[in-house]
Amino acid sequence: MKRQAKPPEKKTKRTTNASSPTPSSSSPSLSSLPDEIVENCLARISRSYYPTLSIVSKSFRSIISSTELYVARSHLRNTEECVYVCLSDKSFEFPKWFTLWVNPNQANSMVEKKRKKKKTIGKLLVPIPSSNLSPVSKSAIAVGSEIYVIGGKVDGALSSAVRILDCRSNTWRDAPSMTVARKRPFICLYDGKIYVIGGYNKLSESEPWAEVFDIKTQTWECLSDPGTEIRNCTIYRIAEIEGKIHFGYTQKTYAYDPKQGEWECCEGEVAFPRSQCVMESVLYTFANNYTWEDDYGCKWWSTDGYGEKVKGLESLLEIHKRNGGSSDNTTKLVACGGKLLLLWEGYMKHNPNNRKKIWCAVIALEKRDGGKVWGIVEWVDVVHIVPTSCKLLHCLVVSV
């Protein structure tokens, strides 16, 4: 039966190319090529096309989900940055992860298209397989092409688990667990290591208050005891500043010096923006507090620590304010592909279905007027609709 069915298939293919001068001039289908050649072709195009190509055939889907494809992309130096978003809600059995899909055919400016069509066509949150072992954790960090989810809660109990999301294949695996279970540890990446501090209410002095994970060797090492004052300190933020791990809050900060292995109290105030990112060695921050007009919005920071507002974003800030972005602290600012991305939870005034919107804006930057930084809003729209109880937990950028 298979031999009899084969000739009609070939005949059908020739019929579709009847307009060609000769049968030999018809182009072969990409799916008819060996997997190695298909893999090489797919490695040369933007990852934005992969969701569409993955539904062409099982063979394409298998190649697109393989790690070999991303090894080929790396060899071709065709890696690109992608945004991963995590949403958490009591109605979810586990936190849900998404990729921010960018329409490769969208125009440079989506603002005009938005006026013509209400339907989102530029960017969407596309779900990826969730881990049924992943804890509900507010501590996650991107390292290259992977995302580390550290600590949190599993079935209401504190967890020492570390789960890794490989963003090349969107698959999960376990990393070695921490030495201590932590609810919400504060984490910071520096020099190939993840520093983890605090994250629980009570702990005996014999148990490590802080530890560090070596990404290369995949091993944990406990840090020296910081003393009673630091153990009991209030921590709102953590950041690496000039080779030291700073943590605390604006009025009172501490630091750990990895080179000396010492803890210290810091003099003066250290600003810990709620949302920040670095692009081309420039720090950008976003503050939600619109009560003080100077603090509300996006700033860029010079090397001498002076912050100045990114100009030209007034219309975006109005949209952000009007759609609930300034009412909470969930706004996320990330740098991706040489542009700034702003994501936030938007609350609806008339909301009979108890739903809210996740908004996204894409901002291109350019320098004008003697070094002033201006933002050009290329696109702003809703990328997802969720229950009002849902939280925008993480927004991270990986390189794949």
UniProtKB/Swiss-Prot annotation:
SUPFAM superfamilies: F-box domain (SSF81383), Kelch motif (SSF117281). Residues 1-10 have a biased composition (Basic and acidic residues). Residues 19-33 have a biased composition (Low complexity). Residues 1-33 are annotated as: Disordered. SMART domains: FBOX, Kelch. Keywords: Kelch repeat, Repeat. Kelch repeats lie at residues 146-192, 194-240, 242-284. The keyword ATP-binding does not apply. This is F-box/kelch-repeat protein At4g19870. It comes from Arabidopsis thaliana.
